[in-house]
């Protein structure tokens, strides 16, 4: 069980945070760019080409399961490698369709276009912001860590690279990590000379378990949001 976002742990690799207890709040984001149709309504864009997505998205192809898995994997791997536990809780604060209407109980067909999830990972308060219709420019695709000492760490995807920032008042340190997320995941976890299988074979099953737990939790949120199905 894999998710390419689980390789986005430069915060850990660059030792920007000492341990998980240094974090007071985490925000996770995946806010995708969108277009507009002839009726002036927001439409999804193809991830690879940027062209309008011709598919009609239906549940379960909404943001909670489709892209929530990416953000949750990134947050949990970051917390885990900072010494945190695998404990997590989440609830749906809001879930809306493509046109901004709340998903109703009993609706088993409409896909969520936007959702706000809230909970804790290893005891740290977490908010996850998912949006498939975030406008022409989209929004942040990564995380934001608020540290106990007042510093902020921002992790984003910009074009063909990841951008990591350490923000202290008006001072910003910035690192650029080129390459696709798939490349980093394959090299760091699967096929590379220092893959997870080589570095820590026992961690493979634990990593798999975390990915399965995340999908199970998001499926549970759908049951709570829509009713048993």
Residue ranges and their predicted role:
Residues 106-114, 118-190:
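NAD(P)-dinucleotide binding in Rossmann-like oxidoreductases
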Residues 15, 33, 78-82, 218-224, ...:
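Phosphate/oxyanion-binding loops and surfaces in catalytic or ligand/nucleic-acid-binding neighborhoods
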Residues 48-137, 209-216:
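Rossmann-like dinucleotide-binding domain that binds NAD(P)(H)
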Residues 94-96, 188-229:
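C-terminal helix-rich "cap/oligomerization" subdomain common to oxidoreductases
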Residues 1-48:
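A contiguous active-site-proximal alpha/beta segment in oxidoreductase catalytic domains
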């Amino acid at each position: 069980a894999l998710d390419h976002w689980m390789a986005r742990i430069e915060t850990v690799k660059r030792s920007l945070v000492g341990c998980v207890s240094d974090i007071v709040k985490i925000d996770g984001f995946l806010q995708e760019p969108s277009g507009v149709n002839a009726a002036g309504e927001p439409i999804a864009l193809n991830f690879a080409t940027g062209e309008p997505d011709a598919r009609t998205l239906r549940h379960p192809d909404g943001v909670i399961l489709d892209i929530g898995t990416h953000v949750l994997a990134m947050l949990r791997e970051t917390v885990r490698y900072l010494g945190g536990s695998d404990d997590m809780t989440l609830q749906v604060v809001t879930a809306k369709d493509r046109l901004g209407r709340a998903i109703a109980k009993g609706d088993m067909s409409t896909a969520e276009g936007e959702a706000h999830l809230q909970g804790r990972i290893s005891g740290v308060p977490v908010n996850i912001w998912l949006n498939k219709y975030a406008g022409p420019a989209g929004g942040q695709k990564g995380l934001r860590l608020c540290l106990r000492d007042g510093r902020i760490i921002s992790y984003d995807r910009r074009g063909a690279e990841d951008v990591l920032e350490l923000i202290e008042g008006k001072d910003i340190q910035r690192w650029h990590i080129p390459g696709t997320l798939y490349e980093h995941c394959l090299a760091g976890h699967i096929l590379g000379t220092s893959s997870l299988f080589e570095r820590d074979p026992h961690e493979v099953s634990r990593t798999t378990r975390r990915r399965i737990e995340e999908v199970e939790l998001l499926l549970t949120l759908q049951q709570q949001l829509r009713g048993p199905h």
